[in-house]
Amino acid sequence: MFMGEYTHTIDDKGRLIIPAKFRSQLGDDFIITRGLDHCLYGYPLIEWQAVQQRLASLPSTNANARKLVRYFYSAACECQFDKQGRVNLPANLMQHAYLERDCVVIGVASHFEIWDAERWASYQDAAASDFDQLAAGFDGLSF
C-alpha cells in the first residue's frame, strides 16, 4: 500500500527520486501516466493490469469512454529506476502535471501520484477546508 507524502526535486534532466518505501513496492518495472487533477499516476505492474481490465470493460461504442481510454493510455510509459532510485519523466507527462522543479510524491493506496508542489499545496488547502463535508458525503464511511 502506498502512503505518505514526500517532497523531492526534479533535476535538469527530468529525473525524480521516488521514495524508497515506494520503490520497494514497485519492483523493477512500473507504469507512469497522466492522472486526474493534473498530476501523474504511478502503478506497480500488477495494479496496472487491474486498471487495464477496468478500462477494457468500458463500452467502445461510447465516445467519452474512447476519449478517456485514448488519453490515459497514450501517455502511459513503462519506467525503470536508475542506480540512484530515480525515474526519468517524459516531457509530455511533466507538461501535463505542470512539473518543473519542486514536486510532491504521495501515496494513494493502490498507486502513487506526482504533483507540482505549489499545485499540491493549493489542492491540500481546498481539501482541508472541505474534509468534514467530503467524508459526510459517503454514507457508511467510517475511519
Swiss-Prot record:
UniProt keyword list: Cytoplasm, DNA-binding, Repeat, Transcription, Transcription regulation
GO molecular function: DNA-binding transcription factor activity; transcription cis-regulatory region binding
Pfam name, any one: MraZ
Superkingdom of origin organism: Bacteria
Matches recorded under SUPFAM superfamilies: AbrB/MazE/MraZ-like (SSF89447)
GO CC annotations, alphabetized: cytoplasm; nucleoid
Every SpoVT-AbrB domain range: 5-47, 76-119
NCBIfam families found in the cross-reference section: division/cell wall cluster transcriptional repressor MraZ (TIGR00242)
Quaternary structure (record): Forms oligomers.
PANTHER family named among the record's database cross-references: TRANSCRIPTIONAL REGULATOR MRAZ
Designated name of the protein: Transcriptional regulator MraZ
Native organism taxonomy: Bacteria, Bacillati, Bacillota, Bacilli, Lactobacillales
